[in-house]
């Protein structure tokens, strides 16, 4: 048989138990309040970090979108594939500039003219200057 503990019902012991329980309950309440405060603080910090991360991710996405030309932003994948399969080496704004200034024609004309002009003009100007100087020296004598 098990020996059961006898209950002592003295006034001192019952008061001691009640006081002890009251302190424990107050202590539990304090611990719960501290825990609630710590949790709310942690939630606040996590939310602020999450909003910061969300804003940086949003900014990165906007930067990536800004890198795509406006004409290609609404294209379907097949259209983009067709566009990229064409061997277009120059970007659209460069082709527009070339069309406006006709750079291909100007560059071919300049390359055809410049070497002959510089060679001919430099040799003829030097010969003219020598002939002029000879004739002027003869007239003075």
Curated annotation (Swiss-Prot):
Residues 116-141 have a biased composition (Low complexity). The keyword Transcription does not apply. Keywords: Meiosis, Nucleus. It comes from the Eukaryota. This is Meiotically up-regulated gene 118 protein. The gene is mug118. Its main location: nucleus. It holds the Pfam family Nbl1_Borealin_N. GO terms for biological process: meiotic cell cycle; mitotic sister chromatid segregation. Has a role in meiosis. GO terms for cellular component: chromosome passenger complex; kinetochore; mitotic spindle; mitotic spindle midzone; nucleolus; nucleus. Residues 106-141 are annotated as: Disordered. Residues 106-115 have a biased composition (Polar residues). It is found in: Nucleus.
């Amino acid at each position: 048989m098990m020996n059961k503990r006898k209950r002592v019902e003295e006034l001192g012991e019952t008061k001691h138990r009640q006081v002890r329980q009251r302190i424990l309950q107050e202590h539990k309440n304090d611990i719960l309040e501290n825990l609630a405060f710590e949790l709310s603080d942690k939630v606040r910090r996590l939310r602020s970090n999450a909003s910061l991360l969300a804003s940086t991710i949003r900014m990165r996405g906007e930067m990536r979108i800004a890198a795509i030309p406006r004409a290609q932003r609404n294209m379907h994948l097949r259209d983009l594939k067709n566009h990229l399969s064409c061997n277009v080496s120059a970007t659209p704004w460069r082709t527009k500039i070339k069309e406006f200034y006709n750079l291909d024609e100007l560059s071919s004309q300049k390359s055809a003219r410049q070497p002959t002009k510089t060679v001919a003009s430099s040799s003829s100007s030097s010969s003219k200057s020598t002939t002029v100087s000879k004739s002027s020296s003869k007239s003075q004598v």
